[in-house]
Swiss-Prot record:
Disulfide bonds: none
Similarity comment text for this entry: Belongs to the LsrG family.
Gene: lsrG
Tree of life domain: Bacteria
One CC-aspect GO term: cytosol
Pfam family of the protein (one): ABM
Organism name: Salmonella typhimurium (strain LT2 / SGSC1412 / ATCC 700720)
Protein name per its UniProtKB record: (4S)-4-hydroxy-5-phosphonooxypentane-2,3-dione isomerase
């Protein structure tokens, strides 16, 4: 299992817009073959910080995800909302 944890920080006045933009990516991603989880999390201490927990069966499923229209649209629309670049950590899922 291929797991990615993405951190995204957005401007104070862009939180609702981020949620709207990311909802479309979430809804498309959970329908992809090979997707096991796609959780969108908000930091309760820092409401402008979000984490995306993505679990796919393998790297090929991740590669496919990055070709989808919902992913490409989300990445494009996120750019002006973020305070800086997204950060990612990749893990091997052992015990889901």
């Amino acid at each position: 299992m291929h797991v990615t944890l993405v951190e995204i920080n957005v401007h104070d006045d862009k939180v609702e817009q981020f949620i709207d933009v990311f909802r479309q990516n979430h809804l498309g991603s959970i329908k992809e073959p090979g997707n096991l989880r796609f959780d969108v999390l908000q930091d309760p201490q820092v409401l402008t910080r979000f984490y995306i927990y993505e679990a796919y069966v393998d790297e090929q499923a991740v590669a496919f995800h990055k070709t989808t229209p919902h992913y490409k649209t989300c990445v494009e629309q996120l750019e002006p909302l973020m305070t800086g670049p997204r950060t990612k950590k990749v893990f091997m899922g052992l015990m889901p």
